[in-house]
Amino acid sequence: KVSSSSANNKLVADGSTVEVFYDEDNNDVTICIIDTYVGTISSKEEKVSDPYVVVNSESLVTEKDASTSVSISGSKARFETNTDNFEEDDVVLFTYSQSADEIKSVVKAESVEGTLDKYTLGKNLTLADTEYKYSKNIAFSFGSETSMTTKSDYVIYLDTNGMVIYVDEQEFDASQYAYVLYTQSSNSRFGKDQVQLVMSD
């Protein structure tokens, strides 16, 4: 719920969802802001009466007074759910209730892979010729946006509005490469092209 206060001026930004509820009986309007945060599944507990996952928050969660943001931990990072839907290290989107002080929803985030063409600090990036705006709660696995380099490969994760909420470096896949140990052309006395490779496995 949002009150008319200067402290709330920056609550709504790219990536926020605003819902308005009108009470006809009292002529009251309630405005709710739903922020989406990003995290990773650090563990899951299946052998209890109410199975749950533990979310490691990558983006900071806004506190009740809206003046500070913190990382959630302990029981606040738990979310009761069907743990079959998640694996450890999954990147997820979650919402958090300030009033209840708990996670309210968790879903797996959609991702896009590609080469970084360019980026504008604090605003957007272009990956594989497509521009994506930043969510207000964007986070980077490598610490800082300024650590990104163009022509390098990244995996970006999108919030429910299609904005970038998490950026990760694309893992090097050694199986896609081979070391050329020996080559032979058809002009040799053996009369055919040959190459000897050493694979990573």
Describe each region flagged by the PLM.
Residues 1-201:
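...the same signal can extend to comparable exposed beta-sheet modules
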